[in-house]
Amino acid sequence: MTFLDHHKLASVIIDRIDPARVTRDLSELITIRSVNPFDDAPSPGCREEELAEIYLAKMQAIRLETGRVDVVDGRPNIWGRLKGKGQGPVVMLAGHMDTVGTDGYPDAFSGRIENGLVYGRGACDMKAALAAFLEVARAIRESAVELPGDLLLVGLCDEEHMMLGSKDFGRTGPKADFAIVGEPTSLRICPAHSGQRTFFIRTYGTAVHSSRPERGVNAIVHMARVINALEGYGENLKRAQHHPLCGYGRFSPGVIRGGSISSAVPDFCELEIDRRFLPGETSEQIVAELRARIDPLAASDNSFRYEIVGPALDVAALDTPVGSPIVLSLVNAATHLFGSPPEIDAFPGGTDAPNLDCPAVVCGPGDLAQAHTLDEYVEVDQVVKAVQLYIHAIVDLMETRT
């Protein structure tokens, strides 16, 4: 099939897009409370199940083959398959169903539509993409176009916390050859992002009454020495290896805990650190870098005791080659639709994309700066453009031989 044929076929499908319908879908999805419960037990309004049930029903109404697996009770992954001819790749459109919390956000679930914007928690992160995925499948179905390969729509749980959904789906879910994850990129094409690992550095001392501090060992004082030893680590990362899209790794001390009462010398202190790492960097490398700075403290002071625990959080890095068919198809689609080559960049945060067991790209409607805010919104026009972009890319990608 030539590029002109791709364009004609995509245009037939795009003609079936209904902007009012995709806007209504998005507004409805926002009204469904799917806040991530984080470490608490799932409860009404704090789990993905209610949204999953509505989304499954919408996929079934389009006559997709659907499935559901609960990763934990009340927290499912779901999917719908639009069958093709069996002669092309399986393309996945994936997004998470959970959102962050809504404290201080009274209109979080309004789904208000005003002046070309849709407001509410999850509007851009990332229910806009979920609504766009539905419209892609509907437009294909209503156009009566039979694709060479299958289209797989996937809703994932727990992205905002431990990414349990995508980790489970990558291991046990239906397989795809390529995936687009619709996180808010303002339709920039992001085939890479750094990973994230958090570690705990713990110092130990000897507790005594603070009237005789010289008889004990102060774990907080030792942690202060650790913090001093780590000064400059972030700057060193800037001068170390670079990734063509992700740039350099980053380090940030984030949380410190220690002591119980001021009248006791503390015997324990803990520092939680965040390390954004480049594709290819390992936990062992990171721990070795930390130890190289802290071990000299122990060598010069017999009372200095510490350990490094983790990673507690481990979000994988993404590194899909820019020459991958999924990247090239999105570039071709965006160039045709919007008149100029699109920006190819690294996504600033972590996503489900590297867990899906296939080449993946992050690309979706919405501005990441609006995510997690108390006035979250997305432009309807960009959601519709996302539907067009996905359709063009899918039609192009379906000619890829895997």
Identify the meaning behind each predicted range.
Residues 1-10, 14-17, 70-72, 191, ...:
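Metal-dependent amide/peptide-bond hydrolase catalytic core
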Residues 2-119, 146-147:
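Acidic/His- and Gly-rich active-site-bordering loop/insert found
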Residues 98-114, 191-202, 329-333:
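Acidic-glycine-rich active-site phosphate/pyrophosphate-binding loop
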Residues 104, 114-116, 136-152, 230-240, ...:
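Phosphate-handling active-site elements
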Residues 117-131, 209, 363:
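Glycine/serine-rich anion-binding loops at beta->alpha junctions
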Residues 126-198, 402:
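Acidic/histidine-rich catalytic neighborhood of metal-dependent amide-processing enzymes
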